[in-house]
Swiss-Prot record:
Binding site for S-adenosyl-L-methionine: E61, E86, D113, D135
Protein name, as recorded: tRNA (guanine-N(7)-)-methyltransferase
Cross-referenced CDD domains: AdoMet_MTases
Organism: Rhizobium etli (strain ATCC 51251 / DSM 11541 / JCM 21823 / NBRC 15573 / CFN 42)
Biological role: Catalyzes the formation of N(7)-methylguanine at position 46 (m7G46) in tRNA.
Similarity field: Belongs to the class I-like SAM-binding methyltransferase superfamily. TrmB family.
Keywords, ordered alphabetically: Methyltransferase, S-adenosyl-L-methionine, Transferase, tRNA processing
Keyword Chaperone included in the entry's annotation: no
Active site: D135
PANTHER family in UniProt: 3-DEOXY-D-MANNO-OCTULOSONIC-ACID TRANSFERASE/TRNA GUANINE-N 7 - -METHYLTRANSFERASE, PENTACOTRIPEPTIDE-REPEAT REGION OF PRORP DOMAIN-CONTAINING PROTEIN
Amino acid sequence: MERRGRATEAFFGRRKGKALREQQAETLNSLLPAFLIDLSAAPPEPLTSLFPVPVTTLRLEIGFGGGEHLIHRALERPSTGFIGVEPFVNSMQKLLARAGQTGARNIRVYNDDATQLLDWLPDASLDQIDLLYPDPWPKRKHWKRRFVSKTNLDRFHRVLKPGGLFCFASDIDTYVNWTLLKCRDHSGFDWIADNAADWLTPYEGWPSTRYEAKARREGRSSAYLTFRKI
């Protein structure tokens, strides 16, 4: 698959932080091949056969950070296949280390631009997409880099099954408002909310993450939005 130029479709920042220690590098190099999705091959039919264990539903998490949420959900729901996208090398290493330690086998990963994976996925193949605490790109000149856009909502709509869910969490008010407006203007999604508690209460079974704890310490509350494909 052709690699996109970062000038046009780069929704992530840096790809590498501190140099990995030798053992961390060994973990990454030994485990990544077994978990990595190869986009040069056509998607398998059915897509659930990506996983070495039987799964009945499929869920995508874009930008899984340290992997706390993804691992928690994978262990909580062994019959769901989880696809995680994260271009940041250090975060990928942490996720794979946790997968190795816990024995979670219902996980597959992609380590580049999420739009490439979305374009590779078959129509109506996913039950849920999670975009949790994405980079808010706070400067106005960078807003075009925010992952929530009409183009990406079109991508979400194509790959989600009818009635599939798009879940978005953020502690940045401007990005929450941005997402509400983008989804309102998109004809393919309904916001599932009857009252404030619906978007101020964490998702069922939600594990707090380090990023969320940091936001709390700094006095920021979070919003948890859920949209259904129509």
